[in-house]
Each structure stands twice: as C-alpha cells, then as structure tokens.
Amino acid sequence: MQLRQKAREIFEKLLAKKDQLFASDKEYFINHINFTFGESFVKANSDTQKYFLIALASTLAVGGKIEFKALFQGVIKNDISPIVIKEVIYQATPYVGFARVCDFLSLCNKVFKKLNIALVLTPQGTTT
C-alpha cells in the first residue's frame, strides 16, 4: 500500500516527522497515516486546533503515551496555546482519573520546560 497524496500533505504539514514505526512497521504506519490524515481528518471537516485537541484527549483517555507524545509535537508545531493544551489534560481527570492524567501532565510539563514555556500558566478557574 502507498501513502496517499492527501494524507502525506496533511501529515507533513501538521507533524512533518515520521516516527519509529515507519522504520520498523512501514505498512502499519502507512495505513495509520492514510486513515488518520487521509480519511479521518478530511471527513471531520474540522479546523486543525479542534482536530488535534480531540486527538490528544482521546489518546490520553486510552493511555497512549507514545502516540500522545507524537501528537503533542504537532500541537506545539501548530501554535496551539499552552493554556488550551493543559485545559484538555486537566478536564480529562474526572473521566479517566488522576493516576492516568498525572503521567500525561508530567509529559506535557517536560516538553513545556524543554521549550521554555512557563509551567505555571495563568489560572483559568471560573468557579469559587
């Protein structure tokens, strides 16, 4: 199977980096990219930010740390606000539990620190 042109264009625009699966499991990687970006992204007819946030939230919910990390790089590359990223992670807590969210929050903080993004973001609470 070949990587479809539309899937390739979207993948390169949003992520631009083949991961380890391309070397070890090329056929799987191609199928994944064709589905994720050639079908799912196109049919969702959503803006890039919304698509990435849904993908981040669902990947967090199932505990996919490796895929979350790959998506996270795309989120940063596409200038999605750190506040919005953390909000997705925070809001997952009541649904998937603190133990699972803690791993992803830690991963997020490591990336933010590496990129010199402040770890203490402006408070967003709206309840008292």
Annotate each predicted stretch with a short phrase.
Residues 58-65, 97:
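Short alpha-helix boundary/capping elements
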Residues 66-86:
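Mid-chain, well-packed structural core segment of small domains
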Residues 49-50, 84:
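Single-residue recognition of alpha-helix capping/boundary positions
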Residues 51-59, 88-89:
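Short, structured motif recognition centered on aromatic/hydrophobic residues
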Residues 1-49, 69, 76-77, 101-128:
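Acidic, glycine/proline-rich low-complexity segments that act as flexible tails and inter-domain linkers
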Residues 34, 57, 91-94:
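Residues within well-ordered alpha-helical secondary structure of globular protein domains
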